[in-house]
Amino acid sequence: MGLNLLPIEMDDIRKRLDREPNEIEWRVIDAVWSEHCSYKSSKIFLKSFSIDSPNVIMGIKDWQDAGAVDIGDGWAIVIKVESHNHPSAIDPFNGAATGVGGIIRDIISKGAKPIALMDMIRVGNLKIRKNVWLLKNIIAGIAAYGNSIGVPVVGGELSFDDTYNDNPLVDVAAIGIVRKDKIKPSIVDKAGLKLVLAGLTGIDGLGGASFASRKLSGEDEIGAVQIADPFAGKIILDITLEIADKVEAIKDLGGGGLAVAVTEMANGLGAIVDIEKIPLRVKNMNPADVIISETQERMLYAVEEKNVEEVCKAFEEYEYPCSVIGEITSEPIIKFRYFGKDLVSLPTNALLEPPKFLWPIKNVRKNVEEKNVDLPLESTIYTVLSHPDLVSKEWVYSQFDYEVNTSTVVKPGDANGAVVSLPNGKLLAIKVDGNPDLCSEDAYECGKGIVAEAYRNLATVGARGMVAVDHLQFGDPKKPEVYYTFVEAIRGIGEATRFFNIPIVGGKVSFYNENSQGKPIKPTPLIVMAGLVQGKLLKNRVEDSSYVVLLGYTRKELGGSLLSKIFKVPSQAPKVRLQEDLLSSEVVIDAINEEKITFAKDISRGGLAASLFNIIVHGYGVEISTKSILSDTDNVVENLFSESSGRFVILTNEPEWIVEKSRSKGIVASIIGKVNKKTSILTIDNTDYDLKTIVNNYFNFLEEVIGNG
């Protein structure tokens, strides 16, 4: 049957049922109990993310399709992150496009209007033509769906590493807006409701949940990839929001198809589904395939009988298929019937409570012998600043209609965080962060670090983080060294979110990100954080003669840094000092509201040098004195490329104000230089380094690589 179930799981369900499941029931169990849908190897740890907060309307405890947070004035935001890694490795266009469609449906399942998307893409070395092909088609798929459906892509991340050569990561986050008293659940609490299905069911995406719960085999798996139809998605979006007041619950048909959607919506009650009533795209489909098909652009609604006609009429006006396929029952049994014959009859609780697994762990944290960095400064600057991770992503943003709906306040690439306007007049900043290189060195510090970095990034536009979702992407959890990094990353994320008092209201776990030889990707957890602008919004601008202020203390911590990755520098990973991140962020927010700064950039990937380069690409030069850097090392390379947390580069005309404000908060700040009109020149300790070639590479690298790919 090609099941992913372990022998222990098969024995477990036999004991619970006191019988042997039939072949179709095995396929249903395989889908519902898949790692993709059940979180059986992670759920016990995810509970540690729960933070009681008066602003949380729907959180991780609720375990629904998206999280929701009160933002005041009767409004709430809905937030979700998802991935389509395995499908994008096989069919990058449809894999990425359906990832966008799926997360939009998660947002509208709460009755919320999607207002922003963010994409996080990681692919392999662009010297390999296949990776160029993957990137082009991933971007094209995201653009095709987002642009067609009218939801702006406002920002994201794009990075490159050999670890993703066979296993690209494609993550999409979405934000929606809804009146908080209009939020819809994805589950029901009473029997007698009719199950209404909108959309056609086809043979695409068969076994997609199971496909996403195993490593890529290198075999023909195209049948497990869903096909995107953004125009149908637009119909689903508009009508779902139109009829939201007429339905009791809404659920997207994602992984596992109807098998999972019906079971989860029933929420401990039961359901009867008549398969012959399901509208089909392909005639004479096998009933078992109908149950687990993951055809896109479908939604399931639980509807009072008196409202069914009105709900279906809304779809009929668009000639979009809509049918009553069953009902919620008081008997806690999930039944799929075909012309009156039971094909599936399984207890709801048995499906919703798969065996939970705690796998062995093996400590892989590295003990590194520190050595002095002895690298030539000039060539090191040129090499690091030329890395593809640091180049402009304008080629990507140009594919997206990021100003559709006119809610985008800060365009992609113009700041460290995206900013959108809300109906209550407030501004919402959004940022995503990940650091797989640091996670490879120390997953615990990485977990703390990505939360802290997202918090700092929001501060650079004047926002304070208030809510987050996470996405945890790892290899096979049964491998002790993989499971160790997973557990450690969760420990770090949990510690940091509790410190900042930021509730994680949802997320995603993606295991089995491995190639056909079983080599796992670098551990790649992500944090998507959102927060309200606290007063004034900072839109970065560079002015001649501005002072360059370095906020925070620099340490000789090069492990997991871009410098270490390129030059194999042995060094300890940075210790994330959350108090320093918090205090330095507060200084930045205060300075923005007092209009004391014109530019703020957190120091992360590429260190201080990369942040200074971010000033230079605006058409200016920068001169600094490394002797002014407050640090535990006098090595110039270490000071320029350390990725110690808690630091910012600030441009100001009142540097002493920044220094004094920092001192009052208990952190350090130093005036290290000035901006000048020497275009593309970085002056370090009175020596000029001409970066014209690097600046040209910054603006043109992606277009040239993609154009030649």
UniProtKB/Swiss-Prot annotation:
InterPro entries: PRibForGlyAmidine_synth_PurL (IPR010074), PurL_linker (IPR041609), PurM-like_C_dom (IPR010918), PurM-like_C_sf (IPR036676), PurM-like_N (IPR016188), PurM-like_N_sf (IPR036921)
Enzyme Commission code: 6.3.5.3
Catalytic activity field: N(2)-formyl-N(1)-(5-phospho-beta-D-ribosyl)glycinamide + L-glutamine + ATP + H2O = 2-formamido-N(1)-(5-O-phospho-beta-D-ribosyl)acetamidine + L-glutamate + ADP + phosphate + H(+)
Pfam families named in the record: AIRS, AIRS_C, FGAR-AT_linker
Binding positions for Mg(2+) 1 per the UniProt entry: 82
Positions of disulphide bridges: none
Binding site for substrate: 83-86, 105, 226, 294-296, 510
GO molecular function: ATP binding; magnesium ion binding; phosphoribosylformylglycinamidine synthase activity
SUPFAM superfamilies: PurM C-terminal domain-like, PurM N-terminal domain-like
Subcellular location: Cytoplasm
Pathway assigned to this chain's UniProt record: Purine metabolism; IMP biosynthesis via de novo pathway; 5-amino-1-(5-phospho-D-ribosyl)imidazole from N(2)-formyl-N(1)-(5-phospho-D-ribosyl)glycinamide: step 1/2
Annotated positions binding ATP: 39, 80, 470, 507
The protein's assembly and partners: Monomer. Part of the FGAM synthase complex composed of 1 PurL, 1 PurQ and 2 PurS subunits.
The protein's role, per its UniProt record: Part of the phosphoribosylformylglycinamidine synthase complex involved in the purines biosynthetic pathway. Catalyzes the ATP-dependent conversion of formylglycinamide ribonucleotide (FGAR) and glutamine to yield formylglycinamidine ribonucleotide (FGAM) and glutamate. The FGAM synthase complex is composed of three subunits. PurQ produces an ammonia molecule by converting glutamine to glutamate. PurL transfers the ammonia molecule to FGAR to form FGAM in an ATP-dependent manner.
UniProt similarity note: Belongs to the FGAMS family.
Protein name (record): Phosphoribosylformylglycinamidine synthase subunit PurL
Gene encoding the protein: purL
